[in-house]
């Protein structure tokens, strides 16, 4: 930056224009003040632009612009658009706000749930279903204290002015644990009156294969919290009826692709073995029996191997782990070349992960965007314009949009 400003100074050196000594002195002072003002403005503008905007290019040749929209937040865990330029966001410390994406101003919202903010727990996801503008319900996931243990909980409320009202817990899951780990959890909607809700194994590995606990499962409910009659384990003894799939470790990303009617999830493996899974009704996704990860304490494979009859293999796995914190299927018009791609935020390897999927649902290519940003990318959401917004654990919100807007 100093090099740029010095270059401007050299190109715009003052030239004496006054002949009389006093007039010359006054003239020089006026010109100096004017020049320094211009120089200061130029340098400030240069610093501002460089701090707020980065120009990058993906490996597929899609140019885009990255802007920082907001800063100074707690860990922004969930984001949902409730208007063309308004993002409702949750912070893990329990705070809720509405971000104006044009001005960057955040309006604080009161009336949220009382959260157990400990370890990986706190106020987690926020999501709004199709038809939000008519019904007004907003859905949250959070960790709730229950007899000294943390429990992943699904709740909903309505927004009235700057306050949440009619707050109600829809499902306090059977997932109590004293560990502060693996709460999940993401919320997504299929557009036909159902929601899906992920719950981590709570750091207790056997939970993944235990149908008598919600931990280590993806759940399916109606929008009022009741259990659909066609859930796979409704009639099975000792199985919880909310369970849609099981054998999961810690799914922190989940998205329902309405165009292809596919439910996708991404979950943390142990040391290696993060997975992208296509979630099907009643299927077992293997944790902790099968995994591509290794034990934390040594170079020993977790479980019995990477495949077993009756258990689903991931469509993609990551070794080493990227630590995925979110997942969406891109459907906008702003980036036509990315339509149908999966995007995930990487926490450990600090990038935006893009995966191309073919018509059969197989992963055919991967791209790692924004590796140079050095930020743990947490939540990810697509705007009505087709731009991507993401949050970071350092408390920032970024916007990624085309370098040249498409019609």
Regions found by a protein language model. Give the residues of each.
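Acidic, Gly/Ser/Thr-rich repeat motifs that build Ca2+-stabilized beta-propeller blades
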Residues: 51-205, 253-256, 261-269, 320-359, ...
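Bacterial N-terminal signal peptides
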Residues: 36-44
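Blade/loop signatures of beta-propeller domains
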Residues: 51-64, 228-236, 295-308
């Amino acid at each position: 930056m100093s090099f740029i400003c010095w270059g401007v100074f050299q190109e715009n050196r003052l030239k004496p224009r006054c002949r009389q000594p006093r007039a010359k002195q006054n003239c020089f002072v006026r010109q100096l003040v004017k020049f320094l003002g211009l120089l200061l403005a130029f340098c400030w503008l240069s610093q501002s632009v460089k701090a707020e905007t980065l120009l990058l290019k993906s490996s597929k040749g899609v140019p885009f612009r990255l802007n920082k929209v907001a800063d100074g937040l707690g860990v922004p865990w969930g984001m949902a658009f409730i208007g063309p330029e308004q993002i409702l966001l949750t912070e893990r410390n329990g705070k809720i706000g509405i971000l104006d994406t044009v001005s960057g101003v955040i309006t604080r919202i009161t009336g949220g749930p009382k959260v157990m903010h400990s370890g990986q727990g706190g106020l987690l996801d926020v999501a709004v279903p199709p038809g939000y503008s008519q019904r007004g319900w907003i859905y949250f996931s959070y960790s709730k204290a229950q007899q000294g243990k943390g429990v992943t909980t699904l709740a909903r409320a309505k927004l009235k002015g700057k306050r949440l009202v009619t707050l109600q817990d829809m499902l306090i899951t059977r997932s109590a644990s004293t560990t502060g780990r693996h709460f999940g959890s993401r919320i997504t909607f299929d557009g036909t009156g159902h929601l899906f809700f992920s719950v981590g194994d709570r750091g207790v590995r056997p939970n993944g294969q235990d149908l008598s606990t919600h931990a280590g499962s993806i759940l399916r409910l109606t929008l009022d919290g009741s259990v659909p009659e066609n859930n796979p384990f409704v009639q099975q003894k000792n199985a919880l009826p909310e369970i849609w799939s099981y054998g999961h470790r810690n799914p922190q990303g989940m998205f329902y692709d309405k165009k292809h009617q596919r439910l996708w999830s991404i979950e943390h493996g142990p040391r290696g073995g993060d997975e992208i899974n296509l979630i099907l009704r009643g299927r077992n996704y293997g944790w902790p029996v099968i995994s591509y990860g290794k034990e934390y304490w040594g170079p020993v494979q977790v479980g019995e191997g990477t495949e077993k009859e009756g258990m689903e293999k991931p469509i993609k796995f990551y070794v080493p782990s990227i630590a995925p914190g979110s997942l969406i299927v891109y459907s906008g018009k702003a980036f036509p070349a990315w339509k149908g791609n999966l995007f995930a935020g990487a926490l450990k390897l600090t990038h935006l992960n893009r995966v191309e999927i073919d018509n059969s649902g197989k992963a055919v290519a991967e791209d790692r965007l924004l590796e140079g940003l050095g930020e743990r990318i947490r939540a990810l959401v697509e705007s009505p314009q087709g731009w991507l917004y993401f949050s970071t654990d350092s408390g920032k919100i970024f916007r990624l949009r085309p370098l040249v807007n498409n019609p």
